[in-house]
Structures are given as C-alpha cells and as structure tokens.
Amino acid sequence: MPGPGEAPLMIPLSRRSSWEAVHQLTQTPHRQDSQIRAIRESAAIRRGTRMIKVLSARQVAGFLKGWLPAGFCYREWDVAHLRTPDELRLLRTDADTHADQPNVAFALRWRAIDPLDYDIPTPEAYPGLVAMPSGYRIGSPVLGTGFTPSSQHIIPEYVTASMADLPLSAHASIVGYTPDGQEATLFTYQPEQRGWLRMAGPQWRGLLAGLGSAVDQEYLPLANNDRGTSRLVGTFRGAEYDTVADPPEFRVLAMTRAARYPVESLSRRTRYASWRGVRCTVVSADGGWVRLRLSQPDSEQVVSIGAQCHERGIYEAWAPAAELTDRELQDTPYPL
C-alpha cells in the first residue's frame, strides 16, 4: 500500500477505454493526448515519497563510493509488484555489457525531499532525450509519454531535474532480490557518519558476491571528494549548515544529537558550468579536468562535447577546467 498522503496511479477504465487500449496509448511514442496526460499526472511525487532505482552491480559499487541518485527512477509504489530479478530487469538503466548474474537484482531506495527535484520526461521537457538516436543511447528509448517501455505494464517514470545528482535522504538503502522474490536490505546510508553500513547477514552473502570488498566490510566510509556534487544546505539562526534530509524533518548535519537542530530554510545546491555552449552539471573534478553531465541531452550536444552515455539518460564528458564558462553554484529552495 502507498504511504500516508500518497496517490496511486489512477487509470479510469470503461467499455470504451479498456486496460489494453490505455496500455497501447502509453506505449505510443510522443503520444500526449488529454487522457494519457491526466493518467500520468495522477502519479504525483510528494515530500517523503519512497523512490527506487534498479541498479547493476557496477552501479551498486559506485553508490558505495559516493554516487548520488540521478537520471531515471520510479516511485516504489508503482513497481512494488515487480519482485524477481527477471521482472526488475525491465527497469535497469545500465548497459547489457554490465550484466550481472541472472539470479540477483539490486535497487537503491530513498525518500523524495521535494517534488521540485523530479521531472516527467516528455517531449516538452526533454525534447532531445525523446528524439535521441538509438546509436547514442543505452537501454530502452524514451517514449515521451511519461511511461517506461513495457509490453505488459503501465509504469510511470521520472528523471531527476536537469539530470542532476540529488542528495540522499537519511536511511536510504541498497536492497537485493532473489529469484523467488525475497528482498534483503544490504546497506543503509548513515548521513552523520558519511558512509554505508552493511546490514546483510551470512545468509545473504550470495547477493553480495559480485560487489568486491563490500562483502567483508561492515562500514564503508565515503571520501569527502565523492562523485556526487549536490548538497543539501539549511540555515539555523542565520548560519548555514550542511543538512540531513529525514522527511518530513530536516536537521543540521552533526555527529552529536544535541547539535542536530531543525533548519529554518532548506535548499539543494548544485554546481553548473558551460562548455562549448552546452549547459551541464559538474559531477567531479580531477586536477585540471572536470567531469560534466548534460542537463538537456540531445544528439548535437553529445557530438559537440564528445559525451558518452553511461546509463539510460546520463551523458557525461571530461573537459579542461580552464575552458569552462558560466560556472555557478545554483540553489534550489524548498518550502518548509
């Protein structure tokens, strides 16, 4: 069942509008009639909505080193009926070259901080992504209806706003799935300790087999210069602090409980820059080079900066730091 205040996807059916007919409309590229739009808008994200992103073992390893959620994702409620690795393969964003053992699937779960962080990938919002040629993309095409391609299911999909990294909420988790549909929490995110705590016991070691050294570590700390570049910042009594998201609560990031004051304002701070006229978010830096991610991917921008598709919807390239223009830290304020 959805959480308090959550709205399930609403599909009005009748003799004239069967499930099969609605499903066909959701799978018709660029179809944006009023019926499909109304159905899609019924699947709204609210503060605290449980989100999910299906991962490969390569992506799990990345998150354990500091990656943040970006690109395509789903409301957990909309995909709760998919329980086995075979079923969850539909939602994967990684390339087939990173295929894992077929009897294992992984996913990242977190809670939405604010609806402002998510977009519906329609032709109006992301025209280049919808029109991306097959040779330039990984995974299934973006239909533009707001639903993921599927021959059996009607599943609303989302992208993070501008394809930017989003700060993880407290108690985010990485879970594993077995062929019989069992689910195990493998790791939980500890924001005050800046790391992941392994939760899986000996009976789940098979799920961890492809994750390298994570099998033997109880705690995996994150480096201060981690891959993610979006930060959650808040103010308390006029001073600015890094902030922990624990919807509906937001507090100062502090090791001691006594210092975890509730913040009075809240924003997501993300780094942006332009290169060769292309607007990007800054993902990481290494010496005189900066890793950029396209905010509005299209085929011309991909060619212009030599971007590579790393997962469905995510296009990144390395650029000389000296050639970047329009650098800025952009704050997205959230209402409290």
Where are these regions (language model features)?
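Short, surface-exposed polybasic-aromatic patches that bind anionic ligands, especially phosphate groups
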Residues: 3, 8-336
